[in-house]
Amino acid sequence: IFEEITNAARISKNGGGVGVNVSRIRATGSWVMGKENASGGVIPWIKLLNDTAIAVNQGGRRAGAVTVGLDIWHLDVPEFLEMQAENGDRRRKAYDVFPQLIIVDEFMRRVEAKAKWTLVDPYEVKQQLGIELAEQWGDGFAAAYETIEAELDKKIKLYKQVDARELFKHIMRSQVETGMPYLAFKDTINRANPNKHEGYIPGVNLCVAPETLILTDRGHLPIIELANKTANVWNGSEWSEVFIRQTGTNQKLLKINFSNG
């Protein structure tokens, strides 16, 4: 984990934005070195990334930009959703990162069906069942998740079942109150991934930089060359003719202070 934080610092130092998925980290109350209820969960590690973003700015131009993703099945999701709220323990807050929640289709199906959703600890799932849940998506995730739920109160002891629709409402309340998290739909992203041979996509980054390569019918081109032009872009399943609009150049950074702090 510390190695990844160091990598994030190096990227930020050179002006890059950083996207990190923390879904493999043990949940709060998990085992550490054989001791039960020893893990502090994902929040302390997110706080380290938060402080790294502040300490290591983007070449002196602006504060570091870090987005932190957590999969919707992780036991720490409820606390993750409160991570930027004004109330609660300030020691478990991280206000300078951009949280993203990684959503799978199975969760949305359960929201629609008003069904239960099970939050689990990735460490216990891997130790007891040999399943690296963070790597699963689509039908593979649905099958793995079914296996996990069949082992509740057997091999899987650390879990919590919630109403899927209530959890989705919690997400929306958090978005209204804080503007975050933004949502990354993992199955949709990976179905549209033209480079599946390189592996799966665990989450998304913050934005598109000028040198980002875009697949067009003329090959991969830096998006800056396509600014304010029409191009045929591959959307994952077909070519789409789109107008690529540059939204701004050397935009000023504004700081807004509210009366309530």
Identify the meaning behind each predicted range.
Residues I1-C207:
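Active-site cavity-forming subdomains of large catalytic enzyme subunits
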Residues V208-G261:
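HINT superfamily self-processing domains
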